[in-house]
Amino acid sequence: MAAAAGRSLLLLLCSRGGGGGAGGCGALTAGCFPGLGVSRHRPHQQHRTAHQRPASWQSVGAAYCSTVVPSDDVTVVYQNGLPVISVRLPSRRERCQFTLKPISDSVGVFLRQLQEEDRGIDRVAIYSPDGVRVAASTGIDLLLLDDFKLVINDLTYHVRPPKRDLLSHEDAATLNDVKTLVQQLYTTLCIEQHQLNKERELVERLEDLKQQLAPLEKVRIEISRKAEKRTTLVLWGGLAYMATQFGILARLTWWEYSWDIMEPVTYFITYGSAMAMYAYFVMTRQEYVYPEARDRQYLLFFHKGAKKSRFDLEKYNQLKDAIAQAEMDLKRLRDPLQVHLPLRQIGEKE
């Protein structure tokens, strides 16, 4: 079409040129329209030039192709207090509505919903009107306060959300109270199911821990029985030693010698016993008290037996601690105060 318009203008100028003839027309054409000048070369060169010109026009047309689409393809309306964004998806060219929660949802949630709805979307992002990219963590309520650009693949949508009046301080405080009440209501309604799931999880954990502990517990009971037996023998041996010492001193005092001779002997025996108790304190850093001495002797025999039997005492202690912690958590979970029961129900359960 541009070539036809050029030829018409050329014929008009030539007809007005008069005496210039073909030469004048050719000069005028070459000077004013170099792209449409009449060539004096051979016909086949002119034919080649005519085939090369449309390629340059096509390249120019592709370079200035616009990717901005009208804003009507993306609309934002409020339904029941929630923003509903309608977007024309690129794959099937059909509109799809996305209902968002202004408080809990973010820009990242909206972008993920777009990609999940249309698998043909390779790149999607949101930019501010001045070209700054909006972070995925930005809330929907903040995004809808101003205009923004939605970029889907190579298409850019200018979105103009409807303006809404900002809440006053009193309305915002009332809204926060309503949110708190809704959260408490949700917790009250769902706490029973949560309690059951948590209790089932703790019971399963207890069963698993007890199964792991069962073989170790059998070995521990056997080692403990042997250590208890040896400790009892030591205690009875101490009593037998004291009885034997008493009999020997009585024999020497009343039958063999007199008290005047045995009195210094008993003094040194008593002082030697005091030295032995002090040596026990120096070695063990514990006072020589019979129950503590007995427990210490029991532990010595137990650790010797565990080492001899290759009993994994560290693993046993870890399992016992885990079981105790799980039982404590289960008891705390079943506590009426933790499930927000009224005081009257607590009194009835007691």
Curated annotation (Swiss-Prot):
Channel-forming and calcium-conducting subunit of the mitochondrial inner membrane calcium uniporter complex (uniplex), which mediates calcium uptake into the mitochondrial matrix. MCU channel activity is regulated by the calcium-sensor subunits of the uniplex MICU1 and MICU2 (or MICU3). Mitochondrial calcium homeostasis plays key roles in cellular physiology and regulates ATP production, cytoplasmic calcium signals and activation of cell death pathways. Involved in buffering the amplitude of systolic calcium rises in cardiomyocytes. The gene is Mcu. PANTHER family: CALCIUM UNIPORTER PROTEIN, MITOCHONDRIAL. Residues 257-264 are mitochondrial intermembrane. It catalyses: Ca(2+)(in) = Ca(2+)(out). Ca(2+) binds at E263. Belongs to the MCU (TC 1.A.77) family. Homotetramer. Component of the uniplex complex, composed of MCU, EMRE/SMDT1, MICU1 and MICU2 (or MICU3) in a 4:4:1:1 stoichiometry. Interacts with CCDC109B/MCUB; this inhibits channel activity. Interacts with MCUR1. Interactions with MICU1 and MCUR1 are mutually exclusive. Interacts with SLC25A23. One of its GO terms (molecular function) is metal ion binding. This is Calcium uniporter protein, mitochondrial. The keyword Membrane applies. It comes from Mus musculus. Phosphorylation by CaMK2 in heart leads to increased MCU current. The regulation of MCU by CaMK2 is however subject to discussion: another group was unable to reproduce these results. Phosphorylated on tyrosines by PTK2B/PYK2, promoting oligomerization. It is a multi-pass membrane protein.
